[in-house]
From Swiss-Prot:
This is DNA mismatch repair protein MSH3. It is found in: Nucleus. Component of the post-replicative DNA mismatch repair system (MMR). Forms the heterodimer MutS beta (MSH2-MSH3 heterodimer) which binds to DNA mismatches thereby initiating DNA repair. MutS beta recognizes single base mismatches and trinucleotide insertion-deletion loops (IDL) in the DNA. The gene is MSH3. The keyword Nucleotide-binding applies. ATP binds at G817, P818, N819, M820, G821, G822, K823, S824. One of its GO terms (cellular component) is nucleus. InterPro entries: DNA_mismatch_repair_MutS-lik_N, DNA_mismatch_repair_MutS/MSH, DNA_mismatch_repair_MutS_C, DNA_mismatch_repair_MutS_clamp, DNA_mismatch_repair_MutS_core, DNA_mismatch_repair_MutS_N, DNA_mismatch_repair_MutS_sf, DNA_mmatch_repair_MutS_con_dom. Pfam families: MutS_I, MutS_II, MutS_III, MutS_IV, MutS_V. Belongs to the DNA mismatch repair MutS family. MSH3 subfamily. The lineage of its organism: Eukaryota, Viridiplantae, Streptophyta, Embryophyta, Tracheophyta. Residues 1-10 have a biased composition (Polar residues). Keywords: ATP-binding, DNA damage, DNA repair, DNA-binding, Nucleotide-binding, Nucleus. Residues 1-77 are annotated as: Disordered.
């Protein structure tokens, strides 16, 4: 048939000609079968033959329509009739069409059924070479992806090409939606030979994606770019449940303490990390806030019903700025109402499924026991934690990831006795992981300490920084490892490292056996590999591709073989430590885990079952290496395909004989194989199928070839199904090695963290901290300490300070001084150095001797929390209340300007009472910054335990007697003594407050200070407040002194307003002295 000429633009948009006047027969219309939906993606020779026969029997080319027929004359009254009908609707009442009365196409019917099963999922339905959205999903896709949505039959629809699936899934997931991918579950070849050959393709939900499950799902990173990924950040799914508890009451009838008990389970599905905790929490939910801030979840699962305050806090945390996804689950979903029974039942099902599919694993489990979640472990968990665990099980079951919770070795409690949990306030106010300017990592303590080379090392270091150690032996072990690596660095440079690495086949060999060279080469090689921690978890979930599997196993094998050259074994005795390459106990333990023969041998064994060349060229059907005892069904399917292909290839001989062409060969064009190409004038049998042609040749498929290709396509599809089942079985067998591989990757991450801390200690003038025994008094002794973050900015211009706090001596410092003098920087510096030391890092000081702290608590800055319904002062006192309840005698407490959010009298009283409680009841180490001089009087009640300090400065008076017009030079050095001036007007000038406002403020300050001075003098003399009349000679002399001082200030003052205030006050004093003639001078 000839190709019809494309219409012009004007003809394309012209109204169509009217249909014939006769009405169609309704009976005939109903009897016609539904339209056939063709969404085939593979070649079907039999279908091509049927199409060819149909075209051959078709009528010849139809004559062209006349121009008048194709482009009718426009009706001038058409627009007028449209407006009349639009503005004057029919008086008949409009009855909307119900869903039951609609006539759906077969594809739409499938979509309706799928949407009824998954109402909360945005579905991407595979239709041919595109993924289509329907209804509301199409509108969401149009808004998020920026694509066009239009009406098609009964639904709005939009689509994206199949090769861009990965990119668009990530964008939709990142926008907070749950995405379901619906794929065709049959191919054209299988469909053409099945009972459904005339119906639509069968489709089913093949994958679900959310923010917490995306990285653990099938590899969809292709084509998305780095900016769309989630990088090295954790993607925790956190489930929260709570229940009411009876609040404690104070004697005055005010409720206090805790009102709920909270259970939390957090799962990092992409790494297999599972954390849990149960604790009492107060009305402000400060404990829950600390957990949420520490885990930084990507998704929250709320167990309903939740208390109103918990729900309010979590919803506010997952606001638009945080981009955290929220999903709710009812606790009524348990079949028998018992969460414990539900978890045990799920674990038994998973265990039975694992062991049933793998006989070797069953024997191994019987011999030594699997590392899994046992009934004993579940029964020992707190009640609410089990509820949260059951909800998490049920939630992950829809994604197929519930098996990760079965790995009991991954579980750890957040309230470990060996780790310190920093509160949400401490993490935020000390800028431990994020800065307070833009919320990024730049400028934080973690960013300053992070010199890791791998993403999983960076994740582990983040955990170390937010959870410092509380065990002196563990801290010393880390410091020993850091010291040894730092000493080994010596004069080695990165250029020497690269020259000492040579290639030996597919492996890297190390010329020098020195430990640092081995460690650096391994970490450098791992930095160039993929995220193997998430890789082994995807393998465990059976979502990894063959290329990723090979890359992960090769990385683990490379690391293990290189570190094996150090000759360190797990059962080595201490007697060989003197001659050993590595002496640190922690380093030897980590090295032995990575280079374990079990890990290396299993990695090699798994790689030997795969065809790397086939994986590189993308031949998925030839990836698995078959043998007599391995994948027998796959071997049979491959053999069947090979036999059919050989039969087809051998049939060329018969065609040579039939056509009398000796050199006839099959031709392959555009992926179509076994073509017979003949000249245009050649005569061929009538049943030969014409496939394509050129000017001089025509290419055919004889009936034998058509039948053979059909048989080959069917055998190939069967091979693909068997291959997928064999690959899934191969991945399932990985479960028995998962624990060993996970431990090896975790050890690699720990080595990377220790190497990072060693780099930090060498790049800057850091010192190893010393820790006193636990039985000794708590102390902090830092000489020439420096702020670890500000020092990187100021370099040599930073001014160091000493800090000495001792439980049996001075354990509280009250710090005063001018604004912008460095008070907050100093107290932050002490806290950050303490945290760094307990992380196991060297610290920025010339000497550091500390006691292991069980907590670092801070109350700094002024901020409200409107979304949580908290004012600035409530937020301030809530943080102080949390500190008072939580701290102990082994804690470091930092309070910065407590009480400034209310009136002066209330603020001073609250600050004084809080500090007195900490000193008398808790006896913890305290750094207290204040602008209230009255607070310093507390040192009288605690002689020798409280010291007053201020940040030093120099002043230069412009004019003698001037008030607050001094030039101030900040020295940033902490010295003993109380500072009574804050130089607030200097800060006002720096902030560019209008000069008129500053002058007026100075005038008011002078007046207020004069009144306060008079009030204090009257108080000393025993006069009632407000009575300023001098009595007796001494009072008159004092009044004259004030008179002359005011006159002196007025004469030297440049500002007329200020001078006037001094003169006015002097006039009042003179008037009072004049009215007392009995006074003798």
């Amino acid at each position: 048939m000839g190709k019809q000429k494309q219409q012009t633009i004007s003809r394309f948009f012209a109204p169509k000609p009217k249909s014939p006047t006769h009405e169609p027969n309704p009976v005939a219309e109903s009897s016609t079968p539904p339209p056939k939906i063709s969404a085939t993606v593979s070649f079907s020779p039999s279908k091509r033959k049927l199409l060819s026969d149909h075209l051959a029997a078709a009528s010849p080319k139809k004559p062209k329509l006349s121009p008048h027929t194709q482009n009718p004359v426009p009706d001038p009254n058409l627009h007028q009739r449209f407006l009349q009908r639009f503005l004057e609707p029919s008086p008949e009442e409009y009855v909307p069409e119900t869903s039951s009365s609609r006539k759906y196409t077969p594809l739409e019917q499938q979509v309706v059924e799928l949407k009824s099963k998954y109402p909360d999922v945005v579905l991407m339905v595979e239709v041919g070479y595109r993924y289509r959205f329907f209804g509301e999903d199409a509108e969401i896709a149009a808004r998020v992806l920026g694509i066009y949505a239009h009406m098609d039959h009964n639904f709005m629809t939009a689509s994206v090409p199949t090769f861009r699936l990965n990119f668009h899934v990530r964008r939709l997931v990142n926008a907070g939606y749950k995405i379901g991918v619906v794929k065709q579950t049959e191919t054209a070849a299988i469909k053409s030979h099945g009972a459904n050959r005339t119906g639509p393709f069968f489709r089913g939900l093949s994958a679900l994606y959310t923010k917490a499950t995306l990285e653990a799902a099938e590899d969809i990173s292709g084509g998305c770019g780095g900016e769309e990924g989630f990088g090295s950040q954790s993607n925790f799914l956190v489930c929260v449940v709570d229940e009411r508890v009876k609040s404690e009451t104070l004697g005055c009838g005010i409720e206090m303490s805790f009102d709920v008990r909270v259970g939390v389970v957090g799962v990092e599905i992409s790494t297999g990390e599972v954390v849990y905790e149960e604790f009492n929490d107060n009305f402000m939910r400060s404990g829950l806030e600390a957990v949420i801030l520490s885990l930084s979840p990507a998704e929250l699962l709320l167990g309903q019903p939740l208390s109103q305050q918990t729900e309010k806090f979590l919803v506010a945390h997952a606001g638009p700025t945080s981009n955290v996804r929220v999903e709710r689950a009812s606790l009524d979903c348990f079949s028998n109402g018992n969460a414990v029974d539900e978890v045990i039942s799920l674990c038994e099902k998973i265990s039975a499924g694992n062991l049933e599919d793998d006989k070797e694993m069953k024997l191994e489990a019987a011999e030594k026991g699997m590392s899994c979640l046992t009934v004993h472990t579940i029964m020992n968990m707190p009640h609410l934690t089990v509820q949260a665990l059951a909800l998490t099980f049920c939630h992950l079951k829809q994604f197929g990831f519930e098996r990760i919770l079965y790995q009991g070795a991954s579980f750890r409690s957040l309230s470990s006795n060996t780790e310190m949990t920093l509160s949400a306030n401490t993490l935020q106010q000390l800028e431990v992981v994020k800065n307070n300017s833009d919320g990024s990592e730049s400028g934080s303590l973690f960013h300053n300490m992070n010199h890791t080379l791998t993403v999983y090392g960076s994740r582990l270091l983040r955990h170390w920084v937010t959870h410092p150690l509380c065990d002196r032996n563990l801290i010393s072990a880390r410091l020993d490892a850091v010291s040894e690596i730092s000493a080994c660095m010596g004069s080695h440079s990165s250029s020497q490292l690269s020259s000492e690495l040579v290639e030996e086949g597919s492996e890297r060999a190390i010329v020098s056996p020195e430990f640092y060279l081995v460690l650096s080469s391994v970490l450098t090689a791992m930095s160039r590999s993929s995220d193997i921690q998430r890789g082994i978890t995807r393998i465990f979930h059976r979502t990894a591709k063959a290329t990723e599997f090979i890359a992960v196993m090769e990385a683990i094998l490379l690391a293990g073989k290189q570190i094996q050259r150090l000759g360190i074994k797990q059962d080595s005795e201490m007697r060989s430590m003197q001659s050993a390459t590595v002496r640190s106990t922690l380093l030897r333990k980590l090295i032995s885990v990575i280079s374990s023969p079990v890990v290396v041998d299993n990695a090699g064994k798994l790689l030997s079952a795969l065809n790397k060349e086939a994986a590189v060229r993308g031949d998925l059907l030839d990836i698995l290496i078959t043998s007599s005892d391995q994948f027998p069904e796959l071997a049979e399917a491959r053999q069947a395909v090979l036999v059919i292909r050989e039969k087809l290839d051998s049939s060329i001989a018969s065609f040579r004989k039939k056509l009398a062409i000796r050199n006839l060969e099959f031709l392959q064009v555009s992926g179509i194989t076994h073509l017979i190409e003949l000249p245009v004038d050649s005569k061929v049998p009538m049943n030969w199928v014409k496939v394509n042609s050129t000017k001089k040749t025509i290419r055919y498929h004889p009936p034998e070839i058509v039948a053979g290709l059909d048989e080959l396509a069917l055998a190939t599809e069967h091979l693909a199904i068997v291959n997928r089942a064999s690959w899934d079985s191969f991945l399932k067998s990985f479960s028995r090695y998962y624990t060993d591989f996970k431990a090896a990757v975790q050890a690699l991450a720990a080595l990377d963290c220790l190497h990072s801390l060693s780099t930090l200690s060498r790049n800057k003038n850091y010192v190893r901290p010393e820790f006193v025994d636990d039985c000794e008094p708590v102390e902090i002794n830092i000489q020439s300490g420096r702020h670890p973050v500000l020092e990187t900015i100021l370099q040599d211009n930073f001014v160091p300070n000493d800090t000495i706090l001792h439980a049996e001596g001075e354990y509280c410092q009250i710090i005063t001084g001018p604004n912008m003098g460095g008070k907050s920087c100093y107290i932050r510096q002490v806290a950050l150095i303490s945290i760094m030391a307990q992380v196991g890092s060297f610290v920025p000081a010339s000497f550091a001797k500390l006691h292991v702290l069980d907590g670092v608590f801070t109350r700094m800055g002024a901020s409200d929390s409107i979304q949580h319904g908290r004012s600035t002062f409530l937020e301030e006192l809530s943080e102080a209340s949390h500190i008072i309840r939580t701290c102990s005698s082994r804690s470091l407490v930092i309070l910065d300007e407590l009480g400034r959010g209310t009136s002066t009298h209330d603020g001073v009283a609250i600050a004084y009472a809080t500090l007195q409680h900490l000193l008398a009841e808790k006896r913890c180490l305290v750094l207290f910054v204040t602008h209230y001089p009255e607070i310093a009087e507390i040192s009288n009640g605690f002689p020798g335990s409280v010291g007053t300090y201020h940040v030093s400065y120099l002043t230069l008076q412009k004019d003698k007697g001037s008030y607050d017009h001094d030039d101030v030079t900040y020295l940033y050095k902490l010295v003993r003594g109380l500072c009574s001036r804050s130089f607030g007007f200097k800060v006002a000038q720096l902030a560019q407050i209008p000069p008129s406002c500053i002058r007026r403020a100075i005038s008011m300050a002078a007046k207020l200070e004069a009144e306060v001075r008079a009030r204090e003098r009257n108080t000393r003399m025993g006069e009632p407040e407000g009575h300023e009349e001098p009595r007796g000679a001494e009072e008159s002399i004092s009044a004259l002194g004030d008179l002359f001082a005011d006159l002196k200030f007025a004469l030297s003052e440049e500002d007329p307003w200020k001078a006037f205030e001094f003169l006015k006050h002097a006039w009042k004093i003179a008037g009072k002295i004049r009215l007392k003639p009995t006074c003798s001078f």
